[in-house]
């Protein structure tokens, strides 16, 4: 890529995505539907079929729309 193209388009973009657990290891549910403190953990399937759990901790979901935009969703 020559310098004129880099001025027009900018440098190539690099994406880095790190995945963190939804809760620390000691807070993960030992039984299905419940966490260690007796609270309920909601389970659902993501778009690609992956399991997502919702507990007292926050996780960030990154979704790409059909228009190529990235959406950050706090769940």
Curated annotation (Swiss-Prot):
It comes from the Eukaryota. Keywords: ERV, Nucleus, Transposable element. Residues 32-43 have a biased composition (Basic and acidic residues). Residues 24-43 are annotated as: Disordered. One of its GO terms (cellular component) is nucleus. It is found in: Nucleus. The keyword Membrane does not apply. Its main location: nucleus. May possess a function in tumorigenesis. Protein expressed at very low level. This Np9 protein is encoded by a human specific provirus. This is Endogenous retrovirus group K member 7 Np9 protein. It comes from Homo sapiens. The gene is ERVK-7.
